[in-house]
Amino acid sequence: MFDKNFDDMQSEEMREYFMQMNNPYYLYAKSMTDLYDEVYKPKTPVIENLLYSGTYLFVGAPKVGKSFFMAQIAYHISKGVDIWDYKVNKGTVLYLALEDDYARLQRRLYTMFGECENDNLYLATQSHQLNDGLDKQLEYFIGKHPDTKLIIIDTLQKIREISGDKFSYASDYDIVARLKKFSDNNNVCLLLVHHTRKQQSDDCFETISGTNGLLGAADGAFLLQKEKRTSPKATLDAVGRDQQDQRLYLEFNRERCIWELIKAENELWTLPDDPILENVSNIVNNENTEWIGTATELVTELGLDISPNSLTRHLNVNADRLFNEYNISYENTRTHAGRQVTFKIIPKETE
């Protein structure tokens, strides 16, 4: 439940911690100072600037082309092939195509990608519901395929149990929150395919079938929509906690059954270069794959005019940038001699 690092705790501190935990009225909270002193696991992109680890909704009207879109991104991620102008990080993909059969999937994939072998894309047409052990099935799959990046559930309704309160905010929020907990614990992306409702709204995301509880619990959502059902042109709107809001203009290639990018409505804002991170990348690289030392030693090594504490806090906050932009893992641990900083180059996957 909590992210307390027991390796960093002294015996007296640990005793006090467990005494507090035994108090039924104890409320666990962090001070702002403690928050800055933590290093959190990086949020890794599956498709950079578009899709990250976490739980997302992918919503559209029936037969608008959602399943073709799911097959397309599943293929690209499993093969490590960039999609449009977006960089893809390769990994195993599990696609629960619960409204399809294997014969239809075979025809669809062959039409889209031709005669192409792919041992990193797995497809299933049946699964348990969430209350009947789906999470255990997914955990088992990840155990067999630890490089799993993406799990697609097509559709969300297929894994929900039918009940009288199925359209309540509480039940909508609960099912997505449970799936989000799973994705966070396993550092994977869950993409939940869902339908829109017929009623229109000024906010396109309010057309998601069900209550606002679905979007409220999710890390983000994608909405695929057409002005005319017979038109090959569509827009894809994206919102989320870890990526910028976007609108992409797409066109469906009817011959190959794939979605093609026509244009993006706006250019994505990028973070400016960070001089401290740049300096770290100069001492940790393919020639020098590891650096271990104290924060004081690191200040000297980098030639910086800041305190060791300020440096480690800056690195704590930017651990995800080090990981995703510079391919460097970062640890900040307590030892008997004080705080120890460790940088390591992450080995790049070879084909």
Would you name each region that the model predicts?
Residues 52-56, 91:
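Pre-Walker A (Motif I) flank of P-loop NTPase domains
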Residues 1-24:
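Short, small/acidic-rich helices and loops at N termini and domain boundaries
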Residues 76-90:
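Post-Walker A helix-loop "phosphate-sensing" segment adjacent to the P-loop in P-loop NTPases
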Residues 17-38:
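Detector for small/aliphatic-rich hydrophobic stretches
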Residues 69, 73:
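Hydrophobic positions on the alpha1 helix immediately C-terminal to the Walker A/P-loop
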